[in-house]
């Protein structure tokens, strides 16, 4: 088993050694799989006023043993985040080459919202699969391989990471947020004919083919991007999977940004994109 751990994860040699040690059935149960050579995951990270968190988040993203294109979009941060990012970008120029991680940095000249930052990141992304990653440490990048498995195995075009499935650890927080999320997800399901448990999740993973179909049509600037993406994925009848994820939610004192106005906007977007493109 120790020999298996010394190999590069998700390579044919790594998988063959684990299959020999654990058996094929156990490997499937554990979600172990082979990633094709030269395959790249684009990680789109919208950032706004996260000077105390983005570095920890980026360290976690970089540590995931996958070849990644990390697209960081600063949405005109005013707390020093932009200065930190630009310094980090400059340091990368003289740092040793990182075989696992390539970086792109995009800076908005005015604050436009998460949806606008995600759309900018989508335009810059060039990987085989794209995932959205918030910069606030609520979602755990170590779960990328689990989320990617249905796509790599050819079963799914899109994967949603659900905070309400399975037995992954969750921080217990606001009841009314939970209730609002369930209401919005249920209403979205009524319009899309999907049976999601967490439409508002940050973790939406999609193939390049899906991205090329829906990205040019996205319009929302703020948190309405979540129901808009969901509606357009459903309209194109892409194969959608849901996977359980952990969640460590923040309080408003810790920097949580979504508010009740965004809930009403999400309601509008569910109806709007449920009825027309």
Which residue ranges define each predicted feature?
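A conserved acidic beta->alpha catalytic loop
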Residues: 74-83, 137
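Acidic helix N-cap motif at the loop->helix transition within catalytic regions
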Residues: 52-56, 79-89
């Amino acid at each position: 088993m120790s020999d298996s751990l010394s190999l590069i994860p998700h390579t044919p040699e790594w998988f063959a050694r684990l299959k020999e040690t654990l058996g094929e059935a156990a490997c499937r149960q554990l979600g172990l799989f082979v990633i094709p050579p030269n395959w790249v995951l684009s990680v789109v990270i919208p950032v706004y006023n996260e000077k105390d968190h983005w570095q920890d988040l980026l360290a976690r993203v970089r540590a995931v043993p996958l070849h990644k294109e990390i697209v960081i979009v600063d949405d005109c941060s005013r707390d020093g985040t932009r200065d930190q990012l630009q310094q980090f970008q400059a340091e990368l120029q003289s740092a040793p080459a990182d075989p696992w991680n390539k970086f792109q940095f995009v800076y908005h000249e005015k604050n436009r919202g998460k949806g606008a930052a995600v759309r900018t990141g989508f335009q810059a992304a060039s990987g085989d699969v794209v995932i959205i990653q918030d910069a606030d440490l609520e979602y755990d990048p170590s779960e990328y391989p689990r989320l990617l498995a249905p796509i790599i195995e050819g079963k799914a075009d899109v994967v949603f990471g659900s905070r309400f499935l399975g037995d992954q650890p969750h921080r217990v927080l606001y009841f009314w947020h939970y209730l609002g999320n369930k209401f919005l997800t249920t209403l979205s399901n009524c319009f899309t004919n999907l049976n999601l448990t967490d439409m508002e999740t940050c973790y939406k993973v999609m193939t390049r083919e899906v991205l090329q179909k829906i990205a040019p049509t996205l319009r929302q600037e703020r948190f309405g991007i979540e129901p808009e993406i969901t509606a357009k994925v459903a309209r194109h009848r892409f194969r959608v999977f849901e996977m359980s994820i952990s969640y460590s939610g923040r309080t408003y004192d810790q920097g949580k940004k979504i508010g009740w106005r965004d809930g009403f906007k999400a309601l509008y977007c569910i109806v709007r994109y449920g009825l027309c493109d």
